[in-house]
């Protein structure tokens, strides 16, 4: 079994009914599409650097003997896992998969809201982590903006629904 067939299996699970739908080769290779994905990749790299840097802070605090709340460890692990997932979605979307584009666009709008709401809870996170969450959110909102341009919405137009067939009931 090769890697691509494993990835296609993952796509079928993650993509649902649109797992096999890809955009036209012309739109996929369009320079505008390419520029958007270059920008998104760099923004995700920045996310990864910030997330990794943020992970270094509690590690250093812990090594120094300070108590680090479990919620900080969990949030950092979740942020790094989400960023990894977003990289996968961006890669598959760049290869033309509609489902990956739609997931990337959706999550780049939802994750910032969740991050900002949790960062606003008094005393939940230390100040350095609240700052990291705000940066994380702003970068994701930038990704959402790139994905919402007219060109990208045209390139990744929602596939038409299959016509519903009436089920005949035997009486």
Question: Where does each model-flagged region fall?
Answer:
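Topology signature of small-to-medium multi-pass alpha-helical membrane proteins
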Residues: 1-171
């Amino acid at each position: 079994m090769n890697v691509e067939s494993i990835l296609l299996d993952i796509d079928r699970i993650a993509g649902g009914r649109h797992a096999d739908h890809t955009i036209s080769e012309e739109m996929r290779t369009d320079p505008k599409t390419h520029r958007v994905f270059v920008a998104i990749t760099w923004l995700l790299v920045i996310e990864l650097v910030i997330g990794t840097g943020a992970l270094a802070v509690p590690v250093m605090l812990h090594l120094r003997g300070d108590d680090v709340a479990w919620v900080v460890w969990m949030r950092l692990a979740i942020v790094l896992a989400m960023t990894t997932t977003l990289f996968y979605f961006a890669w598959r979307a760049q290869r033309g998969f509609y489902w990956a584009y739609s997931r990337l666009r959706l999550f780049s709008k939802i994750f910032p809201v969740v991050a900002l709401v949790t960062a606003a809870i008094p005393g939940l996170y230390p100040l350095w982590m609240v700052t990291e969450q705000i940066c994380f959110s702003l970068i994701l909102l930038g990704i959402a903006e790139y994905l919402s341009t007219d060109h990208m919405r045209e390139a990744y137009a929602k596939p038409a629904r299959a016509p519903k067939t009436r089920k005949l009931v035997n009486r």
